[in-house]
Regions:
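Short, conserved glycine- and acidic-residue-centered signature motifs
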Residues: 47, 85, 180
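Conserved Rossmann-fold NAD(P)-dependent oxidoreductase catalytic core, especially the SDR/UDP-sugar
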Residues: 1-43
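Catalytic Tyr-X3-Lys loop
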Residues: 5, 46, 120
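Active-site loop immediately N-terminal to the catalytic Tyr-X3-Lys motif
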Residues: 39-40, 81-82, 134
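The catalytic Tyr-X3-Lys active-site helix of short-chain dehydrogenase/reductase
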Residues: 38-50, 88
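Structural signature of beta-strand start/N-cap positions in the alpha/beta core
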Residues: 7, 65-67, 138
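NAD(P)-dependent short-chain dehydrogenase/reductase
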Residues: 20-28, 53-131, 145-147, 154-161
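C-terminal substrate-binding subdomain of Rossmann-fold SDR/epimerase-dehydratase oxidoreductases
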Residues: 98-227
């Protein structure tokens, strides 16, 4: 406001949605108006929720023109792909790229937990639509509504690779919520936007890039970005 900034974008997250709406793998409720009563399942989700409120308070009290998007698992080439901070698509691509024919790849939990994943190029398009909107500020979901199980995601990476691999489900205490999928009705209604790229196509591009990194014996590249 002091610098007379015309418009500000805040990248929120689907992690701000209440845990009780994400207990069923097949039927998560992540409509924008389902955020309250608040009950995110992590400190990260609470931080995103409170930050949304802070930006909206600046809008109400100071007239700051804000735009808020709730991202749903953005992925693609040049993203983080190793080290434990990568998203599931990159993790599966890396595990498959590192594996040899006949190997197993590990999937945490029973693999029946569901998620949706949005390719980075489409995320950029959604953000641009939101920033160019004269009066729609959100909060609004920017994500894919193509929901898959994590086992299916792993199978997809294996199919892309052409390798003969199997999946080993590993019991762990914490695997996150059981179901998460972007509800895109609001953004389609207000901005006419919806993702067009199929998950298999985004995974193919991502696998090809990560496979190159693995076969070049690289660690996390310096020019990668966390998405």
């Amino acid at each position: 406001r002091i610098r007379n900034t015309k418009r500000v974008f805040y990248s929120s997250s689907a992690c701000m949605y209440p845990e009780y709406n994400q207990l069923e793998p097949e039927n998560p409720n992540l409509k924008e108006d389902s955020a309250y009563p608040a009950q995110p399942d992590s400190e990260y989700g609470w931080e995103k929720l409170f930050s949304e409120r802070l930006y909206l308070a600046y809008h109400r009290n100071k007239g700051l023109d804000v735009r808020i998007a709730r991202f749903h698992n953005i992925f693609g080439p040049l993203g983080t792909w190793c080290g434990g901070r990568e998203k599931a698509p990159a993790s599966m691509c890396r595990k498959v790229a590192e594996a040899k024919d006949g190997d197993e790849i590990e999937v945490w939990g029973d693999g029946l937990q569901t998620r949706s994943f949005l390719y980075v190029d489409e995320c950029v398009e959604g953000v641009m639509r939101l920033m160019d909107s004269p009066d729609f500020r959100g909060p609004v979901n920017i994500g894919s509504d193509e929901m898959v199980t994590i086992n299916h995601l792993a199978e997809m990476a294996i199919k892309i690779s052409g390798k003969n691999l199997s999946i080993k489900n590993v019991h762990v205490k914490q695997i996150g919520v059981r179901g998460r999928n972007s509800d895109n009705k609001l953004i389609k209604q207000n901005l006419g936007w919806g993702p067009e790229m199929k998950l298999i196509d985004g995974m193919t591009k991502t696998y090809q890039w990560i496979n190159t990194q693995v076969n070049s014996n690289k660690t996390q590249p310096e020019n990668s970005i966390q998405i």
